[in-house]
Structures are given as structure tokens and as C-alpha cells.
């Protein structure tokens, strides 16, 4: 699947201050084929396994208490 990587806090992986290869490295770490820093804000990955958590507007938990 394709999508934005999310951390344990439910927020997208930020790439604003990261080196150019950061997102591609993070995407390959979860067995994705490739990735990039979308609009210099968040890592977007391609061809990841279905078990990888990705950000969704419907299930967004970023910044919210559990």
C-alpha cells in the first residue's frame, strides 16, 4: 500500500529538517519500495506491506489524548 508513515504518537513522520534520503530510508525500513518527503512536511511511501500503519484523516490521532 501507499501512504504517509506514522509514528507511535499517530503523527506523520516529519521530514522538514531531515536530509533528502531520510524518507526513502524510513520507507525501506518498513519494506516499502520507495518514498519521498512530500512538500517538505511528511514522508510518503510506496508499495509497503499492508501491516504498516499509515496516516488516515478518518483515524487521525496526532496531538490527541488517548
From Swiss-Prot:
Positions bearing Cysteine amide: 62
Tissues in which the protein is found: Expressed by the venom gland.
Domain named LCN-type CS-alpha/beta: residues: 1-63
Short name of any one Pfam family annotated for the protein: Toxin_3
Native species: Tityus pachyurus (Colombian scorpion)
InterPro entries, alphabetized: LCN-type_CS_alpha_beta_dom (IPR044062), Scorpion_toxin-like (IPR003614), Scorpion_toxin-like_sf (IPR036574), Scorpion_toxinL (IPR018218), Scorpion_toxinL/defensin (IPR002061)
Domain of life per record: Eukaryota
MF terms in GO: sodium channel inhibitor activity; toxin activity
Protein name in the entry: Toxin Tppa2
Organism lineage: Eukaryota, Metazoa, Ecdysozoa, Arthropoda, Chelicerata
Domain comment in the entry: Has the structural arrangement of an alpha-helix connected to antiparallel beta-sheets by disulfide bonds (CS-alpha/beta).
Biological role: Beta toxins bind voltage-independently at site-4 of sodium channels (Nav) and shift the voltage of activation toward more negative potentials thereby affecting sodium channel activation and promoting spontaneous and repetitive firing.
GO BP, one annotated term: defense response
Cellular component, GO annotation: extracellular region
Keywords: Amidation, Disulfide bond, Ion channel impairing toxin, Neurotoxin, Secreted, Toxin, Voltage-gated sodium channel impairing toxin
Cellular compartments annotated: Secreted
Similarity-based family: Belongs to the long (4 C-C) scorpion toxin superfamily. Sodium channel inhibitor family. Beta subfamily.
Disulfide links within the chain: 11-62, 15-37, 23-43, 27-45
Keyword Secreted: yes
Amino acid at each position: 500500500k501507499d501512504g504517509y508513515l506514522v509514528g507511535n504518537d499517530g503523527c506523520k513522520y516529519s521530514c522538514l529538517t531531515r536530509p533528502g534520503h531520510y524518507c526513502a530510508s524510513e520507507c525501506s525500513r518498513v519494506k516499502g519500495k520507495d518514498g519521498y518527503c512530500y512538500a517538505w512536511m511528511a514522508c510518503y511511501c510506496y508499495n509497503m506491506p499492508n501491516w504498516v500503519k499509515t496516516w488516515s484523516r478518518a483515524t487521525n490521532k496526532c496531538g490527541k489524548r488517548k
